[in-house]
Structure formats: structure tokens, C-alpha cells
Amino acid sequence: MHWSGNWHKDSQASRSVLEQLYIEGVLLIHHKSGSRKFYDLAENHLSRELLERPNPCPDEESFMDWRIRRRIGAVGMLWNRRSDAWLGLGMTTQQREAAFSRLEKSGRITAVKVDDMRTPLYILNGDMPLLDTVRDGQTDAKPRTEFLAPLDPMLWDRKLVEALWGFRYSWEIYTPASKRRYGYYTMPVLYGDRLIGRIEPRADRKAGVLTVSNIWYEPDVRPAKKLSQKIESTVRRLARFNGCRYLQDVTPQDDQNIQNE
């Protein structure tokens, strides 16, 4: 067990050891309680056959290729350029470009041209059928209303988000209150295939209450009755997820439709 909130020197050493064993696969995180992580031996929860399988990435190049594919798959599409989506990979620009070249030549990723964008995006070949289905309008998926967590893979590359949707998002949790444009913990609002605004929900788990401090819609969005109902339904779903009751209604501001809906 280690407690993330304890920064004494003795706990830093134990934390480093536990995290290294976790990275090596010797330990896994069994559960968390607040800021405390409880570890256990991986062999107590995973089969011996799985633990003894050979490494699927026998060399550094194959490991880099796997990590690039994993990031592309998590976001859906990514470009081969400097991006926050590559944070933590420890790759140079040359290494990243070499990995993209190998993956494209081997048919594991495909370049996609997006209207009004000069830089191509790359998608996993296995996701191409889904892209074709959506592009051709053959999907039976229903439009959804969701609040995106600030660290959701869809938001990893905020320059890409702005290029695709014209939506500029900044996570202001570390921004001094006097300098925030919106709120402490705002979440982008996904409505169908559009990012239409930001919402700031606050959950008081001790009191079991979730409230909404504010909603900011994009300039071209008018909160129609249908939209307001979708927002309120999503807020109530978020409250249930957090084990809270919702005490503040999201009142429709007017009965207009979203422009260009």
C-alpha cells in the first residue's frame, strides 16, 4: 500500500519501489481507497500461462510501434506531428516518424485526408470499416450527449480538437482562480457529433449531492428545449455514477434549436 498524499522521504522510497514493481508487472493495483493504492502480487490474480507468455515486443522498434498504435487507437485518429498525445512515450521526432513509416508500410495504419486540413490523420487499419460505415451514413448508432473528462483520450491533443471542431479547450484546474476563463473543472459537452460548450459539475460525495455551477455554450449554440433536456438527463446520469442526488435543475433558456442542427 502507498498513500499518494504522503510526501515524507520514507514514503517516497517505498512508493518508488512499488511503482517500479508495478511497471515491471510483478505487482498490480488491487484497489484504491481515496488516495491510497493497495497492491498485490500479479500472480495472485493472473494465470501462470499469461504471466509466462513471451514479450510480444522483443525489441525497441516493435515496442515503439505498439505504443504509437495504442495512442492512435485510443484517440481514434492522430497526426504525425508534435502532439500532447505523445507525452510520456519518450520518443524523439525521428523515432516517431520512423515508427509511422514502418506502420504505414506494413499496412497497420492508414493516412486519411480530412476536408480543410493540410496535415493527414492516421487511423488503425482495423478501424477503417467503422470509419467507412459512419462516413456513408450506414450506422444505426444513436446520437449521444456526453460530458468529456478533461483527460479523456479524445482531448489528449487539444490542437487537433480545435482543428476538427473549432473548439478551444483548456483544463483550468491548475490556473489561478483570477485568471480562469471558465471554471475549476469544466467538461466539454459532446452533443451528437459536435462539441457545443462546457459544463462545470461539482460532486460533494460526503453530502451525496451533485450541483452544476455553470454551463457555457458556444456562440453559435442556442439551448433548445430538446438540448436542455438532454443536458439535464446527462447530469442526472453523472450524479448517479457518483452516488449523488442532483439538486439543481438545468433550466432551458429558450426554445430555439441549435443553429445548423
List where the protein language model places each region:
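Long, low-complexity intrinsically disordered regions
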Residues: 1-146, 152-155, 160, 167-171, ...
